[in-house]
Every structure is written in C-alpha cells, then in structure tokens.
Amino acid sequence: MALQNEKNSRYLLRDWKPENPAFWENKGKHIARRNLWISVSCLLLAFCVWMLFSAVTVNLNKIGFNFTTDQLFLLTALPSVSGALLRVPYSFMVPIFGGRRWTVFSTAILIIPCVWLGIAVQNPNTPFGIFIVIALLCGFAGANFASSMGNISFFFPKAKQGSALGINGGLGNLGVSVMQLVAPLVIFVPVFAFLGVNGVPQADGSVMSLANAAWIWVPLLAIATIAAWSGMNDIASSRASIADQLPVLQRLHLWLLSLLYLATFGSFIGFSAGFAMLAKTQFPDVNILRLAFFGPFIGAIARSVGGAISDKFGGVRVTLINFIFMAIFSALLFLTLPGTGSGNFIAFYAVFMGLFLTAGLGSGSTFQMIAVIFRQITIYRVKMKGGSDEQAHKEAVTETAAALGFISAIGAVGGFFIPQAFGMSLNMTGSPVGAMKVFLIFYIVCVLLTWLVYGRRKFSQK
C-alpha cells in the first residue's frame, strides 16, 4: 500500500522540515533519532542474516557434508549477488511505500532463509542446490541497506547526514561481526534442543548444532519487526514514483561515485564474506573463527567515524587519504602470505585488520561525499532551469536518496567478486596473490579518480 493510502495514519509525518533550525530542535531531532536507532537495530540484524554463510560454510564439512572449496566460496559469495541486484529495486521502495512500512516488510521476510537454513544443515543429504537457493534468499537481507540508508537520509538535515548515515551504516554493518562472534559460540550450546535439534559430535568431544547459527536470529527479527511497526514513521514529503527517481541514473557522478563506493564498501563486505575461508586455506592450523569477527567489527565502527570526520574535514579529503592507505595495506599483504615458506599469520591478520579499518572509514566518507555532491548538483541544476528553492530542495532530497540506494547496490557487488576472486586465484595458482594484485591496482585507480575528479578543482555540476 502506497503512502497516499496512509493519510490518516498517526505514523505519517505530513510536515517534515529538518532544515528549519527551530523545527529540528523542538521536534525533528527527537523523531529522527528514534527512527535512526530502530533502523540501526533492523539493519544490524539484516547484516547478520546476509553474512550467515560466511560462518556456516567453514563448518558444513564438519557435520557430514562434502563440498569442495570452490563450492564453499560460492556459497559465501551468492548472498552478495542477490543482495546487490535487489538493492536496485529496494533503493526506490521507501518513497513509494514509506520507510516504516518497508522496514517492517523487509525485516520480517528475513525469517524465511533463517528457518530454512536451520532445517537444511541438519540433513547431510541436503543437495547443494538447496543451499544455493537459501544463500540467494539471504541476499534479501543485504538489499535492506539500500532502503535503510535512503530512508534515514530523509530524516536529517544536510549538516548532520554524514554522521547519521555513518551511524546507520556503521552500526548496521556491525551485524557482520556480531554474527561472526555469536555463531561460533552458539553452535556449541543446546539452545534449540527442545525443538529436537541434535548436534553432530566433533573430534575434540564437543557437539556442533549448526542450525543454531541460523535460528538464533529468528526471535530477534520478530522483535525488530514489531519495533519498526510501532516506533518508526513515514514522511509524506518523501513520496515519489519510480519515474521521479530514475533520472538520477543519467548523472555521471552516480557512476564515478559508484566505483569509489565499490572499492570501500565492496572491500568491506567482500573481505567479511571471504576472510575466514581465505585464512583457513592459507593457515589451516589456525582456528580463524575465533578471530574472524574482529575485522568486520573494526570496519563497522570505522564507518561511523568516517562519516563523522568527513562532516568536519570533508569527504573528498578523507576518502583520498583513505584510498592511499588501502593501497599500502594491499601491497603489504603480499609479504605475509605463504610462498616458499609458511607465511606469517600474525602479520597477515594485522594487515587484514588494516584493510578492514580503511574499508570501513572509506565506506563512511564516500557516503558522505555522495550526499553532499548530489545535493549540490541537483540544487544547481534545478535553479539553472529557473526552479524555486523549495523545488530544488525537494528534488535534491529525492535524488540524493535514490543515489544512495543505487550506489549501495554497486558497492554490494564486491561481496561477490572478492570471495570469487580469491577462489579463482586459489584454484588456478594455489595462491590468492593474483586476486590481491587486482585489488591493489583498483585502489590505485580510485586514488587517481578521487584526486582528479573531486580533489584538484571544483567538479562539474552535471
């Protein structure tokens, strides 16, 4: 049901003016913060579901399955494929259905892949094709990011959007590390024994109940759905059809900024999905699941910081410096990998933590760039055509939200390509070096792109 059918709802905000200082201080900021924190909770759980397979795949063969390394890397990558594709339509949904309604729907449906995965892992005869379908369904969780970020952008004034988007995206991204921290612990606890879940004995005498890794999120998703229904709002002025939002695809800056976001958020989500499997192949004697959560945790916290410092120092400056460090860490990684020797796990882990840190910081700074740049170019374009300030502001809000959602879809593609690149490189050469060379070159290209287009001079308002 579209927003126009919600005219009499107490959840519909008919007069929303966050740029008005008096309105913001007296009323707006309290409503915006409530919507932000509920959004953070829903998005955090969505990221938990999106990255489920990054923790599940490393344990599948321990409970009776016999999948190849390529198959396991594929399962970790597939949620990012569907998540990236679904982010495109998801980015247009909030102005059509409303942020509250869409958050309720998009959170509730995540219960389906969680329940199904918990059932599937209990039968070692479950076909690989079933896991492919479940992995693709987990991608719906990744799509939530596009609608969530677009929705929150409507609630905050431009001066606070970097911080607000950083908090929403950063703490939402924290779901990756929460899942990778909780899953390895909960699978050894008989949480759902009352449902007849029988664990599989392990060589060390423990009993693994892998279904717990999926089912533990079901009650939390139900609670978050109820919270979104009862505590969030829809904004009447944010209403726009798909036709109103599609012109954003014609903007050159949409595609340039998509590349930058692919390098930052794409790296964060790709490394989150593939790091545990990569570390397991390079350092098989290390129990990586006890350490894997820390990288996504650093990246998620860094995203919030990246948005905040970009509001203060400028997103372009922060992004440029960040890409330089991403390139440096990528180059250092070559020195830590096993070659003729056994490699150095401590150095490998430390350098990867640096990559997670910079990927997180860059995710926050590039999103701040997107919000600022699209607001500027839209206002400039509307006024050049003789439009009023009110019209310019309205179109700027709509185009910025659409751009944030669409660019987030491009960024999510990294969650597929990075694990697949690692898997392909390992399959062809027995080493991930080939994949890392590609990443290093890409980061260098992004340094040049950021500097030449946005850093040296005032960019073209097109």
Curated annotation (Swiss-Prot):
Keywords: Cell inner membrane, Cell membrane, Membrane, Nitrate assimilation, Transmembrane, Transmembrane helix, Transport. It is a multi-pass membrane protein. GO terms for biological process: nitrate assimilation; nitrate transmembrane transport; nitrite transport. InterPro entries: MFS, MFS_trans_sf, NO3_transporter, NO3_transporter_NarK/NarU-like. One of its GO terms (molecular function) is nitrate transmembrane transporter activity. Changing residue 113 to C/L: Decrease in activity. GO terms for cellular component: plasma membrane. Changing residue 99 to T: Decrease in activity. Changing residue 266 to A/P/T: Loss of activity. It comes from the Bacteria. Induction: Expressed preferentially during the stationary phase in the absence of nitrate. Residues 1-35, 98-101, 147-180, 228-258, 309-317, 366-401, 454-462 are cytoplasmic. It is found in: Cell inner membrane. Residues 57-76, 123-125, 202-206, 280-287, 339-344, 423-432 are periplasmic. Changing residue 139 to E/I: Loss of activity. The chain crosses the membrane at residues 36-56, 77-97, 102-122, 126-146, 181-201, 207-227, 259-279, 288-308, 318-338, 345-365, 402-422, 433-453. Changing residue 414 to L: No change in activity. Belongs to the major facilitator superfamily. Nitrate/nitrite porter (TC 2.A.1.8) family. Catalyzes nitrate uptake, nitrite uptake and nitrite export across the cytoplasmic membrane. May function as a nitrate/H(+) and nitrite/H(+) channel. Could confer a selective advantage during severe nutrient starvation or slow growth. This is Nitrate/nitrite transporter NarU. It comes from Escherichia coli (strain K12).
